[in-house]
From Swiss-Prot:
Regions of this protein lying in the Cytoplasmic compartment: 1-7
Record GO biological process: cytochrome complex assembly
Protein name, as recorded: Cytochrome c-type biogenesis protein CcmE
UniProt keyword Cell inner membrane, yes or no: yes
Job of this protein: Heme chaperone required for the biogenesis of c-type cytochromes. Transiently binds heme delivered by CcmC and transfers the heme to apo-cytochromes in a process facilitated by CcmF and CcmH.
Signal peptide: none
Keywords: Cell inner membrane, Cell membrane, Cytochrome c-type biogenesis, Heme, Iron, Membrane, Metal-binding, Signal-anchor, Transmembrane, Transmembrane helix
An example molecular function term from Gene Ontology annotations: metal ion binding
Gene of this entry: ccmE
Species of the source: Aromatoleum aromaticum (strain DSM 19018 / LMG 30748 / EbN1)
Length: 148
């Protein structure tokens, strides 16, 4: 085999390996990518059914219900415009309470019930995840526009 052919074969092999590595990285990234949606977007059907994503907003006052098993909790997340029912099996963060900001990650069932696999509570009086704050602001603006 001539040196030129060897070089060409080596370059082609290196390009093939590089393309394969990039494809594997992109595939892994896509599988771990979790999108954020507001309760309004979820209620309007803009969120994927059966695929993991996050919902952020406020825990609706009076919505927390604990099951007899002591592990399952049901509550609702709202952006003041729409309300999404959430079911979570596990222990909730200490800062989780009604009327406070929260972000839940999980999947939306065909019945519209959000099955959370993770619950994140806001950290202090002044903190709210930027996406959740934006969603609440947008919902309040929309509600004011409708009232006028």
């Amino acid at each position: 085999m001539k040196p030129r052919s060897k070089r060409l074969l080596l370059v082609a092999g290196a390009v093939a390996l590089l393309v394969g590595a990039v494809a594997l990285v992109l595939n892994a990234f896509q599988q771990n990518l979790v999108f954020f949606h507001t309760p309004t977007e979820v209620a309007e059907g803009k969120a994927p059914v059966g695929r993991a994503f996050r919902i952020g907003g406020m825990v609706e006052t009076g919505s927390i219900r604990r099951a007899a098993d002591g592990v399952t909790v049901q509550f609702a997340i709202t952006d003041t415009a729409k309300v999404i029912p959430v079911s979570y099996k596990g222990s909730l963060p200490d800062l989780f309470s009604e009327g406070k900001g929260a972000v839940v990650q999980g999947t939306l069932g065909p019945d519209g019930q959000f099955q959370a696999s993770e619950v994140l509570a806001k950290h202090d009086e002044n903190y709210m995840p930027p996406e959740a704050q934006h969603a609440v602001d947008q919902a309040q603006k929309a509600a004011q526009t409708v009232q006028q």
